[in-house]
């Protein structure tokens, strides 16, 4: 039986609808860039690569032609085949957990298991409405680009922008602000592809 995504997301949508409506979806235009060979950037990139497992929490706003919602999220990443994304509301006990274990996606809510599938990306789109490459999400949240693709470094010596195709979709990202931790890590990220916008606000980092 195919479960409708609206059933799971309605309480989550209601709790953060205003956040979704006020998303700043415009790319910054006044950013100045520096070379990829900048020593400070290269040192930062080396430190990012040493972070193998981590967790973070925050807010996620999503806009497409068919969907518009926002939710709190909890991201727990162990390795490329084991990670979990939990969507939740502060106004109700409703949660939606998207967990990948050994490359198989398991979907559950606060009442128990719902579905499992080998095609994680397809299941995520079917149930939640987001067409998001979760296998890339771990690097994107860290601010770590694919070095073989197009990306740009800002004058603050941190990743500012990337643009490259994933699964026949051109994805662009703009890193709007960073937490000034011992290791600077992203705070606000704007992700876009054709017909989709994803605004991420990361509140907490643990690694």
Curated annotation (Swiss-Prot):
GO cellular component term of the entry, any: cell outer membrane
Keywords tagged on the record: Cell outer membrane, Chaperone, Lipoprotein, Membrane, Palmitate, Protein transport, Signal, Transport
Tagged with keyword Magnesium: no
Signal peptide span: 1-20
N-palmitoyl cysteine lipid attachment residues: 21
Lipidation (S-diacylglycerol cysteine): 21
Compartments in which it is found: Cell outer membrane
Source taxon at top rank: Bacteria
InterPro entries, sorted: LolA/LolB/LppX, OM_lipoprot_LolB
GO biological process: lipoprotein localization to outer membrane; protein transport
Similarity section: Belongs to the LolB family.
Protein name per the record: Outer-membrane lipoprotein LolB
Protein encoded by which gene: lolB
